[in-house]
């Protein structure tokens, strides 16, 4: 019975969201598609899509409620929790009444001399238990109410992406296959090596390959558009709904007034996810750069590279903390060691290579490639599996900025700022829906996704 009641309450949960253009959503889902299936966590604040690889790499895509044209999440468990908390608070009163009745019966059966003393002790003990139970029930009820309401399920991410592009016009797919999805793939449109017609056979980590694999067409047709919200393609509207545990995820896609497609995707029990959380208070280093810079750095790494070290260093990282006060250490005499920089060191079968990106000391320096640079005491060189970090190449090609953060334990966080999530209405185009057109103009937000990667064990690492 309790299990059935929980399932019934979960089945009453309602999630409904609408979007006037699915381009941003599709590109965001493609960025975290490192696995076939993904875990979706829905709450009143929005959706979170999580994929995990080898218990070492996690990808998170955050779709906040304000990114949708309309978003509604209702949880029927609120009523169930409310009734449970009321019952919990009423239990101590029932216990106190029973205890008082028991004390009165004991008083009538005991002698007059000892009854006053025993009843006084019984009443004091009863009041103490009542206060303790009331306090514990109140804490439990407050803890239940403090927990955010959410529901999690698992879906086939590749199916979801394919459904969003059912009418076309969403934009080219960002494949993760053995051709264009290679970590070393670098589009070179307009280069002298490209053959006439725009068709390119670009240099990859594994030699020369077709830039877009089995997909035939010119680079202009198949290449990624840096402005996915151009007015050349028609927008695909979407309505997403989910009715709770055991129910499918329903997508209603519409491009024209007379064309409507309804897709029902199966949902599964969410898989176990590794507890990987980046705590901001444990951050020891942070760098914000343009995604193109990070992409070019990863592209230049040799194909046989297995291990990559990342070092964020500055003269301030040599300082020590004394409580809230920071004491600067004497500046080193070596100019190279005193420079603030982001350093990559890759080890491959053919040797090792190093790349250094100096940090600009002044915001007015136009030659600086790093927008923000933070290196606190405790920042040290950390090694990572490059085959996992190379999974970020697809999102590097479609993002604008990249924030690289590192904590004391070496856990690294890549946060990618994606292009504008909503589609701007074309100039002079008639708006069939005034509300949707107004929403497209207002409150445009930058979406982002995050990759978390654990470091290698340096105690057993052979460099």
Swiss-Prot record:
Pfam families: Rad1
Biological processes annotated in GO: DNA damage checkpoint signaling; DNA repair
Catalysed reactions listed for this entry: Exonucleolytic cleavage in the 3'- to 5'-direction to yield nucleoside 5'-phosphates
Major subcellular location class: nucleus
Residue span of region Disordered: 81-128, 172-203
EC number: 3.1.11.2
Presence of keyword Nucleus: yes
Protein localization: Nucleus
Entry keyword Hydrolase: yes
Residues passing through the membrane, by range: none
Record-annotated disulphide pairs: none
A GO CC annotation given for this chain: checkpoint clamp complex
Keywords in alphabetical order: DNA damage, DNA repair, Exonuclease, Hydrolase, Nuclease, Nucleus
Top-rank EC class of the record's enzyme: hydrolase
Disruption phenotype: Cells are very sensitive to UV light.
InterPro entries: Rad1_Rec1_Rad17 (IPR003021), Rec1_exonuc_Ustilaginaceae (IPR003027)
Biased composition (Basic residues): 90-100
A single GO molecular function term of this UniProt record: double-stranded DNA 3'-5' DNA exonuclease activity
Protein's job: Plays a central role in regulating the genetic system of this fungus. Has a 3'-->5' exonuclease activity.
Record-stated family: Belongs to the rad1 family.
Protein name, per record: DNA repair exonuclease REC1
């Amino acid at each position: 019975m309790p299990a059935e009641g929980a399932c019934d309450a979960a089945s009453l949960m309602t999630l409904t969201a609408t979007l006037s253009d699915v381009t941003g959503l599709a590109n965001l889902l493609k960025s975290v598609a490192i696995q076939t299936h993904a875990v979706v966590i829905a709450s009143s604040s929005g959706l979170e899509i999580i994929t995990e690889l080898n218990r070492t790499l996690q990808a998170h895509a955050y779709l906040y409620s304000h990114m949708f044209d309309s978003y509604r999440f209702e949880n029927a468990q609120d009523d169930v929790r409310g009734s449970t908390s009321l019952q919990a608070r009423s239990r101590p009163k029932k216990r106190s009444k029973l205890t008082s009745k028991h004390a009165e019966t004991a008083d009538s059966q005991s002698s007059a001399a000892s009854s006053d003393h025993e009843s006084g002790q019984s009443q004091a003990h009863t009041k103490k238990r009542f206060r303790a139970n009331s306090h514990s029930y109140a804490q439990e009820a407050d803890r239940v109410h403090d927990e955010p309401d959410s529901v999690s399920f698992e879906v086939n991410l590749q199916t979801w992406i394919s459904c969003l592009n059912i009418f076309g016009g969403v934009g080219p797919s960002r494949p993760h296959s053995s051709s264009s999805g290679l970590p070393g793939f670098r589009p070179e449109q307009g280069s002298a090596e490209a053959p006439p017609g725009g068709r390119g056979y670009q240099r990859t980590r594994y030699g020369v390959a077709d830039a877009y694999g089995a997909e035939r067409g010119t680079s202009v047709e198949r290449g990624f558009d840096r402005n996915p919200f151009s007015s050349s393609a028609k927008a695909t509207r979407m309505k997403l709904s989910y009715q709770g545990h055991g129910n499918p995820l329903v997508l209603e896609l519409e491009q024209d007034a007379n064309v409507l497609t309804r897709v029902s995707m199966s949902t599964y029990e969410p898989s176990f996810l590794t507890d990987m959380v980046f705590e901001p208070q444990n951050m020891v280093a942070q760098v914000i750069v343009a995604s193109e810079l990070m992409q070019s750095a990863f592209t230049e790494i040799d194909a046989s590279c297995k291990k990559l070290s990342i070092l964020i260093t500055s003269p301030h990282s040599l300082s020590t903390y004394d409580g809230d006060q920071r004491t600067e250490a004497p500046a080193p005499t070596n100019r190279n060691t005193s420079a603030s920089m982001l350093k990559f060191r890759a080890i491959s079968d053919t040797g090792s290579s190093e790349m250094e990106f100096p940090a600009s000391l002044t915001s007015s320096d136009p030659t600086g490639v790093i927008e923000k640079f933070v290196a606190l005491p405790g920042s040290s060189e950390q090694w990572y599996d490059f085959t996992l970090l190379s999974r970020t190449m697809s999102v590097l090609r479609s993002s604008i900025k990249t924030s690289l953060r590192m904590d004391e334990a070496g856990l690294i966080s890549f946060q990618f700022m994606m292009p504008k999530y909503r589609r701007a209405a074309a100039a002079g185009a008639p708006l069939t829906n005034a509300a949707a057109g107004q929403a497209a103009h207002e409150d445009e937000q930058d979406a982002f996704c995050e990759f978390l990667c654990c470091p290698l064990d340096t105690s057993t690492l052979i460099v």
